[in-house]
A protein has these predicted regions:
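Terminal targeting signals and extreme-terminal segments of soluble enzymes
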Residues: 1-280
Length: 280
């Protein structure tokens, strides 16, 4: 089973009733002992779009309200509105009688979309600032044995050498809170579920400036899927900014190799004990 097929199998849902699905999180898509946020986003995306007349979640918003445990859970789906061109609904991820994630999404169908296109966002210059061969596989084993998250190990990810904080000397004065990387799930071209997963694929990019900061939970995530990619390999560019009282925003753009912007995301995350960890 290739990487693409493995991911699709990890999204398996069991229909419990007309509006409820059950699933067991796949440990290959975990951060430590917790399901990865982008993986949960993909699961909720699949549950909702399976019930809507439009198959493509063009805008998704999820609030991570509490920890999702590595055990069976349910997805409770509510359809809010359907129309000719789009539809909307929400999903509650419920585990042990507690809502751990709240998801809402607007869906449409790329096959039938029409309208003007312009104001394109080009691939970033940093992509070509060094040879592709100089990008480094994201692997923290040289930094700390066993520290590479399992969700990172399920795809090919090569990071710009300036952003490989685990494999260079840290310089908070000169390093950016940024990560640029080539991405690919071998075996298929990314669909909307894979793009949901990849929208949260980058570990917190503040680490490129400050080094390892421990657990940095994502509190809210917005993902916009702009179009389906035409190439298997993708390029992602993530940038963090405006740390305030430990909270910061992280913005990501994802392109295919033809230069098409296929997805964007923005998340709000929190550095726990940030004053202590960054200033020490």
């Amino acid at each position: 089973m290739n990487q693409f097929e493995q991911f699709q199998s990890a999204l398996e849902l069991t229909k419990v009733s007309d509006t409820v699905f059950s699933f067991t999180p796949d440990s290959r898509y975990f951060v430590g002992n917790t399901p990865h946020g982008g993986y949960l986003l993909a699961l909720m995306n699949k549950a909702l779009t399976s019930m809507l007349p439009h198959p493509c979640a063009i805008n998704s918003n999820v609030y991570y309200l509490d920890r999702t445990e590595p055990e069976p859970a349910e997805l409770h789906v509510e359809i809010i509105r359907t129309s000719r061109g789009s539809s909307m609904g929400q999903v509650k991820l419920i585990q042990n009688e507690k809502i751990t994630c709240l998801y809402s999404s607007l869906s449409s169908d790329f096959q039938y979309m029409k309208g003007h296109s312009g104001l394109a966002t080009p691939l970033p210059e940093i992509m070509n600032s060094v040879s592709r061969d100089n990008f480094k596989v994201m692997n923290y084993e040289n930094f700390k044995l066993g520290s590479t998250p399992s969700f990172i190990q399920q795809l090919d990810m090569s990071v710009h050498p300036d952003h490989a904080w685990w494999d260079r000397e840290l310089s908070t004065d000169h390093a950016d809170a940024r990560c640029s990387a080539y991405l690919e799930l071998q075996g298929g071209v990314a669909d909307t579920f894979v793009l949901s997963y990849l929208s949260d694929i980058l570990p917190p990019v503040v680490q490129n400036k400050y080094g390892p900061l421990g657990w940095i939970p994502t509190l809210a995530l917005t993902c916009n899927i702009r179009q389906l990619p035409q190439t298997k390999q993708l390029f992602i560019d993530g940038l963090a900014k405006d740390i305030s009282n430990g909270y910061f925003e992280q913005d990501c753009n994802i392109w295919d190799m033809d230069g098409n912007l296929v997805a964007t995301s923005r998340q709000l995350a929190k550095i726990l004990k940030s004053e202590e960890k960054i200033s020490s």
